[in-house]
Amino acid sequence: MLTEQQTLELFPENWERNEQVLLKYPDGLPKDVLADQRVDNTESQVKDEITSNITNQTQILLPADSFPQYGSYPNNSELDYVVCTKCDRPFLSEYIEDHHSSCNGIKPPKPQFEPVANSQVLNKDVNNGNNAPIKNGVKSTAKGSAGNHEKNSVNGQKNPEMPPKRRKTEENKKPTKSALPKKEASKKKNPKVKGPVDVEKQCGVLLPNGQMCARSLTCKTHSMSSKRAVPGRSQPYDVLLAACQKKNQVKIQRQILETAKESEDNQHQAPVDSDEEVSFIMNVLQKSGNQPLEQKVFLPVKRRHSYFRTRELIAAAFRHGEQGMQVTGTILGRVIPFSARQPL
């Protein structure tokens, strides 16, 4: 502890210790000031208790505004989240009514990603740097502008004098003549050479360019008289045209027969369905007389013979012994002419 003399030596100030002190409230503090001080003291005590409790506890109390998102006890309770269809924000299922009442339907903004520059262009810029030659003494100005740009960037300002550099990418490069494929050049250089016109099989009418028409004998662009007047044919035009039409008909018939054979082969080669085959056979049997293959006998043979014997006995009783009588009448017409007394 410093003595009074030492303190005066350290702080040489002109003041007297016995100086009279004037008080603001000589009679004591009023009631209003005392009440305010008490309220301030109680608030400070409550804050100190809360901070002490928070420091002692491991969990931190959440405000009431964050209950719809995290719940009152997020570490102890199981949270059931629901995503809103209007604003795409998650909230607890307990607060669905409160959220619908306060939901405005505005979705949160999506993060915008900047496009990544071409790696080849960046590598070229890094490798080149400032080593590229600049004509007409522009290199010094470029360096000066670059220095100014760096200073302005450090100070947080952009240099308006620096124009943006334009670089050509590989996509913007136009293909040169040497890059064209060799096949296209060969096609242009080597046109097709037309052969001589066969008058026996082709039209042969002279065209305005001095060449002969290379269409077939059935050419529809030229008239029949002009086609008949073509020289150099061994036979008349009509005979050659008829022979050509016959050949075409034979070809058409051959094609028809070939297609028919192919269709038959395809039908035989196709897989047979058992259900279709059964249905086909049943339809054929129904349409072939409607008679079963085996008939059921409703009356045995022995009983049928007994019926015949009784019928003959009755018929003989009605005849009164006349054996040469003609078999006519309702009853006698159904009688078999053999003796009923003789056993069968």
Swiss-Prot record:
Coiled coil: none annotated. Residues 123-196 are annotated as: Disordered. The keyword Secreted does not apply. It comes from the Eukaryota. Residues 190-256 form the SCA7 domain. Belongs to the ataxin-7 family. Component of the 1.8 MDa SAGA (Spt-Ada-Gcn5 acetyltransferase) complex, which is composed of 19 subunits tra1, spt7, taf5, ngg1/ada3, sgf73, spt20, spt8, taf12, taf6, hfi1/ada1, ubp8, gcn5, ada2, spt3, sgf29, taf10, taf9, sgf11 and sus1. This is SAGA complex subunit Sgf73. The gene is sgf73.
